[in-house]
Amino acid sequence: MASKVDYQSGKKHGLQLKNQESELDSIAAEFAGELDEATLSKYKTQFMSYDINNSGDIDHYELQLLMEKINQPKTYLELKKMIEQVDSTGKGAINFRDFIKMMTGKTSSILQKILMFEEMGKKSEQPKGIPQKRSISDLP
């Protein structure tokens, strides 16, 4: 008896990510006149990393995980209030348009400050390879 279980979910996930990325690109195109390509790309990457289930929205659960990741755990009501400050659709989740507006400062919120704080906390990439030669005159 053949099993009808689809073991190729990796392909489905890849397609889902590709579709989400194309949707986010089309939304980012709306902001192309206001922001440069590098900034929009950075926001898209951030949004995709926060949107764990690839639904196109950051919901309460995903925001809770983000806050716990940066050691700022919040209650359900605090998370709900943070989302309400940014949410323009009334769905109770942050879509990519709201995320860009929040990050560009068009809607100031505590969530914007927390996300910027998280970016500052990331370690910069260390140079790899052999260190450059220095002379005594280079020392402070």
Curated annotation (Swiss-Prot):
Keyword check for Metal-binding: yes
Domain EF-hand: 38-73, 74-109
One GO MF term: actin filament binding
Organism of provenance: Dictyostelium discoideum (Social amoeba)
Keyword Phosphoprotein: no
GO biological process assignments: actin filament bundle assembly; ruffle assembly
Binding site for Ca(2+): D51, N53, S55, D57, E62
Keywords: Calcium, Metal-binding, Repeat
SUPFAM superfamilies hit by this protein: EF-hand (SSF47473)
Membrane-spanning residues: none
Full protein name: Calcium-binding protein B
